[in-house]
Every structure is written in structure tokens, then in C-alpha cells.
Regions:
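N-terminal leader/targeting and accessory segments in enzymes
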Residues: 1-106, 110, 396
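Residues in the short beta-alpha loop(s) of Rossmann-like NAD(P)-binding domains
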Residues: 22, 45, 152, 229-230, ...
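Short internal beta-strands
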Residues: 38-45, 224-228, 360-361, 380-389
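Short beta-strand "acidic-cap" motif of Rossmann-like dinucleotide-binding folds
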Residues: 39-43, 148, 170, 246, ...
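Beta-strand->loop->alpha-helix junctions that form or flank phosphate-binding loops
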Residues: 40-44, 68-69, 106-109, 241-260, ...
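C-terminal helical cap/extension that packs against the catalytic core
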Residues: 55, 373-431
Length: 463
């Protein structure tokens, strides 16, 4: 009997609540219902607001519902609660339920408990989706059967029973998922740690602690990849219990991957260095993507051949919404970098181009500082188009820089993304590059960065 089979047998008579019916939870609920388990959907939407088709489908399978203002009250009468990453682990009601003896878990936590195969886990403030995808692509190129999930891809728990021990799971994990994790992956990679999501975590200490949970439960055979160029990340080296690997864009490392002075990505261990691929042969632009490749190389080294790594480097075209080329109109190139929800990611995007840009920025206020944007924007941006709740803060940070008076930077304020795109088109000249690089989350205008990116692409394609 597999761990998954035993798990479902043991909870057969339990009452299980699911907070929210997002894509991952919907498949999970269907799985649990198919096992004959009593399920309750908890959602703050009222019955009138709830998706009618989903309601009818789940009701027909025997699912209960707790909807509206007091949707969480029912969890005190349940045995197990699956929270979504969007439901803060230290939420007052969740905390009370936990103290009352209710088991609080998540799709990823339970997947880690039941997964029969090796798990690669990636987290970080920036670069985690691309790095997760690169690891997955490299393993696929080597002929592995790969399952990608977590914060990207699909829910993995619904397919855990189809996995074998020769498969590989590659998961991206956010701080919201990690804060309650009690297991670590076999291979862990932390791309970087910079201020992010402080509107939820409250303090940088809690945010770093959540990220550190990725490696807090390792054993002696675990592998960890850390960023030597990022102070907060390399501080976590003392927590590593297994093999420590590092990467650097700036200098050679003792064990791990680095970029040498000739532009070659290298791997070094036990005094032996192997050159792998030149940075100019990597299809996706930007020095930050070189860092993502170094992270992935260190993570898969020994499992993947150099030939497979080079194949991915030369052919992988990137992930949607990450400096994604949209189109060229009248000699002006348009890029969608909607994923750039933090200043560090925006700076990385600006450094991907060898010219001054027209940048559309602004959005939801995550209570993070924008001062780091001041110098790069004044140096690398010719026109800054601002919208959203953070427009004032970004403009203040940029204009208070000593570089601003001589930069020639023009700042334009707009109210909508439609207006921003039309303004950029009007002000752009042949040879210009326009990027959507928000530096913020999208919650004030869109449900997520993907919706914002898709809207931007639609607007550009309609020009």
C-alpha cells in the first residue's frame, strides 16, 4: 500500500473543509469527493456570487457549502482544513481552529507528505518561476518524467497516486505556502531574498523565516542552492544540514555555479571547474536570467548532462509575463514584464536592455520601499508612465534622487492601462522599447499579474 492510499483510507471518515475554490482546490475537492470523503467548501462569496456550474457539480457529488460573511465558522466542526496560499496561516480564525484541535494543512504540505519521488523546491523574492521552469526543462531534456506545480502549473496532490519513485516533482513555493511547511524538498534552491509581501507578513523577519522554512527540515542527503550575491540569502547557509551549493554572477564559488570573466557559466566542485555555456548563447535576455540559469545548473548538477543544459539554454524562450516580447509596431518593441512586482525585478528588467526605455509602472501598494528604483530609473528610463495606488510613492522616490535633475526623465501620470498604452504609443519613436514593469502587485486593478499582463498584450495587439 502506498503512502497516498494509506492516507485516503485513514481519513475516510473525516470531515474535510477547503477554503476557496481556486483552480488547485477545485481538482482537490473532486479527488476527495471521489474517495467518499465528506467535504465542505468554505468561501466568502455568497450563494448568488458563487459560480453556479461549480456549485451544481460539487453539490451533485455530495459536497457541503459554507458561504458568505461567516464562511469560516464551520471549520471548528471539521477535522481537517485545507487553506489556500492566499489565506494567511496566522489568520485569527485559523489560529483559533488550530488551537481547538483542527488540523490545518494545504495542498503542498500534504503533497510533500505523500509524494513517492524526488522533489526539487524553489523559492525566492524574484526569479523563482523561471528557475523552477528551467530545472523542469533540464530534467525533461534528460528524459525524466517531470511534474511541475506549487505556485505554478497544476495541483500535484490530485495526481500523486499516478506518480512513481522514478519521476521527479519540481515545485515553486511562495512565502505564503512555506510559512506552514514542515518538510523540505530533496533539493532546495533560494534565488534571493528582498523585501516583499510585507503587507501580509508585517515584518521582514517573518518573511525571511517563511523562506527559510524551505531548508529547515532537511537531512544529511539534501542539497541546497543559495545565492552568494544576496546578503539575506547567504546568511541562511548556517541552517543547511546537507550539501551546500552556491552561485554567483560576481566571482568563483567553492562548490556550485558561477559566471567567469569570459562570460562562461561554470560549475565547480572539489577543485575541478567545468565550463558549460556562454551567456550570449542563452536565448532569454538579461543578466538576471543568467543568475536563474546558474541556480538551475547547481540544482540539477549530477542529474543532467551538459548537453541537456546547453539544449535548454539555446532553445528555451522564457515564461509568459517575464520580459515577454509582445510585438513590434512602427519600429517600437513592446515587452510584457507584468511579473515584475518588486523593485529588484524591475531593475533586472531594465538591465536586460542596452538603451533607455519607456516604462509603464505602478499598482497595488505592498508597503515595500521604492527608493531602490531611483537610480536605475533615472539612468535607464526616458519616459516613466505611472498609474495605480503607488504612483505617488514611485514618483517621489525617483524625483528625490540627485540624478533626477540631469536625467532628462519625463514622468507622465495616467489613470488606466489603456491610457498608459496609448500614451506610450504617442510618445515613442522608432527604435524605442516599451515595457510594462509595474514594480507592484496588481490587486488594485486586476486579480493577479497574469490578468494584468494579458490585458496589456491585448491592448498592444489592438494598436
Amino acid at each position: 500500500m502506498t503512502k497516498a492510499q494509506r492516507y485516503f483510507m485513514e481519513i475516510k471518515d473525516k470531515r474535510v473543509a477547503f477554503i476557496g475554490t481556486g483552480v488547485s482546490h477545485l481538482e482537490l475537492i473532486k479527488l476527495f469527493l471521489s474517495k467518499g470523503i465528506r467535504c465542505v467548501v468554505c468561501d466568502k462569496k455568497t450563494e448568488d456570487e458563487f459560480d453556479e456550474l461549480i456549485y451544481e457539480e460539487l453539490s451533485a457529488k455530495g459536497c457541503e457549502f459554507s458561504l458568505g460573511e461567516h464562511y469560516l465558522d464551520i471549520i471548528f466542526n471539521c477535522d481537517i482544513v485545507f487553506r489556500t496560499p492566499g489565506m494567511y496561516y496566522n489568520d485569527e480564525t485559523i489560529t483559533k481552529a488550530r488551537k481547538a484541535g483542527v488540523a490545518i494543512t494545504s495542498e503542498m504540505e500534504t503533497f510533500f507528505d505523500l509524494c513517492p519521488c524526488k522533489i526539487y523546491g524553489v523559492t525566492g523574492s524574484d526569479g523563482k518561476t523561471t528557475t523552477t521552469t528551467l530545472i523542469s526543462e533540464m530534467l525533461k531534456a534528460e528524459g525524466k518524467r517531470v511534474h511541475i506545480g506549487g505556485n505554478i502549473g497544476k495541483a500535484l496532490l490530485p495526481i500523486v497516486e499516478t506518480m512513481s519513485d522514478s519521476d521527479v516533482a519540481v515545485v515553486e513555493l511562495s512565502s505564503f505556502q512555506l510559512i506552514s511547511m514542515r518538510q523540505s524538498p530533496n533539493v532546495a534552491a533560494i534565488t534571493n531574498i528582498t523585501p516583499n509581501h510585507l503587507n501580509v507578513h508585517g515584518t521582514m523577519e517573518e518573511y525571511i523565516g517563511a523562506k527559510a522554512n524551505l531548508i529547515a527540515h532537511q537531512n544529511g542527503y539534501s542539497r541546497t542552492v543559495l545565492n552568494e550575491d544576496n546578503e539575506e540569502t547567504i546568511k541562511l547557509a548556517d541552517l543547511v544540514r546537507g550539501m551546500l551549493l552556491t552561485f554567483s554572477l560576481k566571482h568563483p564559488v567553492q562548490t556550485g555555479a558561477y559566471l567567469n570573466d569570459d562570460g562562461m557559466l561554470c560549475y565547480t566542485e572539489k577543485g575541478r571547474t567545468t565550463e558549460i555555456v556562454h551567456k550570449d548563447d542563452i536565448r532569454i535576455p538579461g543578466i538576471h536570467n543568467v543568475a536563474n540559469y546558474l541556480t538551475a545548473i547547481a540544482a540539477v548538477w549530477g542529474e543532467v548532462s551538459i548537453q541537456s543544459i546547453v539544449q535548454v539554454a539555446k532553445n528555451f524562450g522564457g515564461v509568459e509575463h517575464r520580459i515577454e516580447f509582445v510585438r513590434e509596431i512602427d519600429g517600437v518593441k513592446w515587452y510584457n514584464d507584468s511579473i515584475a512586482t518588486s523593485p529588484t525585478r524591475v531593475i533586472a528588467g531594465l538591465n536586460s536592455f542596452n538603451q533607455k526605455l519607456i516604462v509603464i509602472a505602478g499598482g497595488y501598494d505592498k508597503k515595500i520601499p521604492f527608493e531602490p528604483l531611483a537610480e536605475p530609473v533615472n539612468k535607464n528610463v526616458k519616459i516613466l508612465i505611472l498609474l495605480g495606488a503607488t504612483a505617488d510613492k514611485i514618483e517621489k522616490a525617483v524625483t528625490e534622487s540627485p540624478l533626477y535633475p540631469e536625467s532628462g526623465l519625463k514622468i507622465v501620470r495616467v489613470k488606466t492601462l489603456e491610457e498608459a498604452v496609448l500614451t506610450a504609443q504617442k510618445m515613442a519613436e522608432k527604435g524605442d522599447v516599451v515595457t510594462l514593469s509595474p514594480a507592484c502587485a496588481s490587486f488594485d486593478l486586476y486579480p493577479n499579474f497574469e490578468a494584468r499582463g494579458r490585458h496589456f498584450k491585448r491592448l498592444v495587439n489592438e494598436l
